[in-house]
Every structure is written in structure tokens, then in C-alpha cells.
């Protein structure tokens, strides 16, 4: 069929050359000779994906004096020969069309020259979780100034909420603590905690980032984190850090080992800022650190690049109508807080409804994930491994308990992950059931879980004490 390609190229007035592996050294030499002998000013390579060898062919063209953007690839492999391998005639017609359109596009291409613009050698990293902190450290260790912006009073993101690490089961907070302190103490990293990005202006290489430092109403220079204000504060609200499993005060710090170890007053819930006469925290503070007159501060920083590392949120479990919105139906992050020694129960596994030890716990994976018709179409990737970790930690905390795990597929990605899951089955007695859960509802003191085991083709009903949902990320 290559004669038809020759006919096409001759009809368009272009030079035609054929080589079985054009990306090879002989193929590249053939391109060089064709350019030199025929005084070409543009090249179309009819072969594979641009992601593989576009730079290769453009480099050859540039070396022969052709503008790199006058070199195009007509992808007749992935777009044509592979998907239509069983229809050679139709594939040939499609290949001819792809080549024709690529040639016509190339005739209209303009010669481009990459621009070099001055770069402000500073970077703003938005998000103080583990990804944002790692990015900040990598950039700072390369010698550049970094502004790390975190909306919460302390650094760490979701990582400091976790109980343990997958595979090692080491304490998550202890594992991440050295990184947090390295960020805080790095001379090239300036941390804007309890701050938010208001606006970004500018262009590539030069951005102006407007930041809002929210008023903490606590003078950090005077406060020694004694915690007396928090202890005496009369206003309690659900704790965001503990996923609403317990309460915090209107004046609070995220968690006892928070870095920065800074107290803030939540003006949305503080009685004093909502029309009531209350100054208890100010009255009991021995250092006079409470300052109700503080205002938000707007600042601008000039940077050449931004890194957005704003983390994730879990798909709300309330969106799953088939699963009852019950106190003992938790999402994965809530269960992490129950497992954590710094959590609302001090690491003791207790049902939120009555504080009893759950003897049967059902873990449901892919809740809201891999469901394109109703929820999210994608796999959240991390759920299989953190569910295995949670189930193992549950069994070690409650040896007489039983953990059931409903799954679709076990995607144990990463070195040692498959063995970790197998260890849970063999050593801790985790029971994996392949199938979806159709309904969860309260049945007296128990939670009825209706599902199916597709391997045995049987309907399953489990009366559990607690259900943990691996929600889509």
C-alpha cells in the first residue's frame, strides 16, 4: 500500500520517503538527506504517537535549519493501524486522510520561536499538607524562596489525622512531624498559616499573589499555649479535626501537637463576636494574649510560579441514599480518628452511638467510586490499602472482633501492598467478600448490611455493630 502513499504525496507536490523505523538512526539520516537534497522547509512524519518521538523529529528538522514547529507527526499507528488491524482497506483510507489533513495543517503553521521571559525566582505553594510541604522543601532545597500558604492554623493536612501508615503501621503523626519541623525551620520557607489566597494576577514568570492572613484574636508572641483559654471557654462546636466525632471550643488549636502550636478564636462561633457578652478567655489568660481587636491582614507576594497542592475531600456519605445516615456508619477518615491515640476516644475503638466496643465491623469499598451512572466514575486508588490497614488495626485493638470487607477488586498497587493485604487475611482473619452492598439500615442495636458475594453467587446479610465506608476521593 506504500505506492498509494507515494501517489498521494506526488499529488500534493511533496517529497515522499519510506523507512520501516523512521525514529532509528538510518531513518533520521534519511530525513536529513531529504531536507538537504530537496531544500525542504517542512516535514510530516507518518508514524507513531507524537508523545514518543515528536521531539526527536523536531530536533532533526531544527539541525537542518527548519523551524521545529514546521515538523508535524501524522499518527497513523495509534489512530489507525492498531485500532483497525482487521480492516486494512478502511485503515489505509483513514491513514491517507490523516496524512492529507496533517500536510494541510502544516502548510498553515507559523514559524514559532520560544520566548525567554524574566523569572521571579520565588514560588508560592498553596496547601500545607504533605504534598505542599514536600513541594516547598524540594524547591527551597534548590535555593529558591518559598511562600507556603495553609488555610488551617497548623500544617499537616489530612496526613496528621491518620492513625498509622500503610505497610509499617507506624504512627502517622510521628512520621510526618520531622517534615513539619523542617518546613517551619527552613530559612527559605515562609509559612502563612491560617491564611487564604484572595487573588492571583500576572503572567508566566511574574505573578502577584494577594494573601489574607486571618485574624487569630490571639497574640502569638504573648501566648505560651497553656490552654487555659480553651479549658474555660463556654462555647463548644463540632471538631473539624476529629470529623465531628467530638467537640472543640470556640478558642482552640487543631490538635495538641499542632505546628505551629497556635491558638485561634473561631469568630463564626465565638459568643463575643456574635452579640453576646463573653470575655472569659480574655479574663483567664495569664499573659494578656487575647486580642479581640485584631483584623485580617492583606499582603502581596511576588512569585514566578505557583504550586497548587490543596489536597482532597471525601465524597459525602449522605449522597448514598441506600445507606442510612446513622451515627455508627462512618467514613474512612472518621474511623482513622477512632483508631488514632490522639483521637476522640484515645485510640479505643468505640461506637459513636453508645460507646460500646464493636464486635463486628463491615468495611465497604468503592462507595461513590467506579459508579459513573450515579456518582464518580473513577477508582480513588488509595481505598484498598487504607481499608486493609484499618481492618488490621481494628483486629489488633479488638482481637475477638470480626472484620468483613466488601470489595469489587483489590487494587494493591505498590511494593509490598499485595503481601500486606494477604497478611491481614492470614494473620488477622479478615474476611473479604467480593460484591457490592445494596443497603445499610438500622435494625435495633445492630446495623443490617445487605450485600452479595459474587464468587459464591449468594446474597449476604450481616448484622454489624459498625460500618466503615471507603468514600470516593
Model regions: which residues?
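Metallocofactor- and cofactor-centric catalytic cores in central/energy metabolism, strongly enriched
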Residues: 14-37, 54, 63, 76
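Single conserved hydrophobic/aromatic residue that forms the stacking wall/gate
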Residues: 1-16
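Rossmann-like dinucleotide/flavin-binding elements
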Residues: 24-26, 35-38, 81-86, 91-156, ...
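C-terminal catalytic lobe of FAD-dependent flavoproteins
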Residues: 419-473
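Short, well-ordered coil/turn residues at beta-beta hairpins
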Residues: 46-47, 309-310, 364, 464, ...
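N-terminal glycine-rich dinucleotide-binding loop that anchors FAD/FMN and/or NAD(P) in oxidoreductases
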Residues: 14, 33, 59-75, 89-97, ...
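Core beta-strand elements of the Rossmann-like FAD/NAD(P) dinucleotide-binding domain
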Residues: 219, 298-305, 457-466
Amino acid at each position: 500500500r506504500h505506492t498509494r502513499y507515494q501517489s498521494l504525496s506526488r499529488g500534493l507536490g511533496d517529497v515522499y520517503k519510506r523507512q520501516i523505523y523512521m525514529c532509528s538512526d538510518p531513518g533520521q539520516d534519511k530525513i536529513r538527506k531529504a531536507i538537504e537534497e530537496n531544500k525542504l522547509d517542512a516535514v510530516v512524519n507518518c508514524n507513531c504517537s507524537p508523545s514518543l518521538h515528536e521531539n526527536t523529529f523536531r530536533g532533526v528538522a531544527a539541525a537542518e535549519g527548519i523551524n521545529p514547529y514546521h515538523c508535524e507527526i501524522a499518527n497513523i499507528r495509534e489512530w489507525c493501524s492498531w485500532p483497525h488491524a482487521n480492516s486494512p482497506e478502511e485503515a489505509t483510507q483513514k491513514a491517507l486522510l490523516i496524512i492529507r489533513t496533517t500536510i494541510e495543517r502544516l502548510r498553515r503553521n507559523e514559524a514559532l520561536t520560544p520566548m525567554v521571559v524574566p523569572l521571579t525566582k520565588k514560588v508560592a505553594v498553596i496547601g500545607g499538607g504533605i504534598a505542599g510541604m514536600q513541594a516547598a522543601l524540594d524547591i527551597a532545597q534548590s535555593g529558591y524562596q518559598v511562600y507556603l500558604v495553609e488555610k488551617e492554623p497548623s500544617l499537616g493536612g489530612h496526613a496528621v489525622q491518620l492513625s498509622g501508615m500503610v505497610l509499617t503501621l507506624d504512627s502517622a503523626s510521628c512520621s510526618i512531624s520531622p517534615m513539619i519541623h523542617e518546613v517551619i525551620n527552613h530559612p527559605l520557607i515562609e509559612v502563612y498559616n491560617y491564611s487564604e489566597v484572595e487573588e492571583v494576577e500576572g503572567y508566566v514568570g511574574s505573578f502577584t499573589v494577594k494573601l489574607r492572613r486571618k485574624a487569630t484574636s490571639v497574640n502569638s508572641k504573648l501566648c505560651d499555649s497553656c490552654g487555659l483559654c480553651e479549658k474555660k471557654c463556654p462555647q463548644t462546636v463540632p471538631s473539624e479535626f476529629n470529623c465531628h466525632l467530638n467537640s472543640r471550643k470556640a478558642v482552640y488549636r487543631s490538635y495538641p501537637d499542632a505546628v505551629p502550636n497556635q491558638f485561634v478564636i473561631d469568630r463564626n462561633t465565638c459568643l463575643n463576636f456574635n452579640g453576646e457578652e463573653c470575655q472569659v478567655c480574655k479574663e483567664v489568660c495569664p499573659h494578656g494574649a487575647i486580642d479581640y481587636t485584631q483584623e485580617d491582614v492583606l499582603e502581596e507576594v511576588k512569585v514566578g510560579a505557583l504550586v497548587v497542592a490543596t489536597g482532597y475531600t471525601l465524597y459525602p456519605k449522605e449522597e448514598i441514599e441506600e445507606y442510612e445516615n446513622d451515627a455508627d456508619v462512618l467514613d474512612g477518615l472518621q474511623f482513622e480518628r477512632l483508631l488514632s491515640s490522639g483521637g476522640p476516644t484515645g485510640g479505643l475503638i468505640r461506637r459513636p452511638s453508645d460507646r460500646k466496643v464493636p464486635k463486628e465491623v463491615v468495611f465497604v469499598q468503592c462507595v461513590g467510586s467506579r459508579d459513573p451512572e450515579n456518582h464518580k466514575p473513577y477508582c480513588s486508588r488509595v481505598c484498598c490499602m487504607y481499608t486493609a490497614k484499618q481492618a488490621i488495626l481494628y483486629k489488633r485493638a479488638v482481637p475477638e472482633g470480626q472484620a468483613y470487607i466488601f470489595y469489587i477488586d483489590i487494587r494493591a498497587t505498590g511494593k509490598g501492598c499485595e503481601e500486606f493485604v494477604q497478611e491481614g487475611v492470614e494473620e488477622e482473619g479478615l474476611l473479604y467478600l467480593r460484591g457490592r452492598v445494596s443497603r445499610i439500615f438500622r435494625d435495633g442495636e445492630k446495623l443490617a448490611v445487605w450485600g452479595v458475594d459474587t464468587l459464591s453467587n449468594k446474597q449476604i446479610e450481616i448484622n454489624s455493630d459498625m460500618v466503615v465506608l471507603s468514600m470516593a476521593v
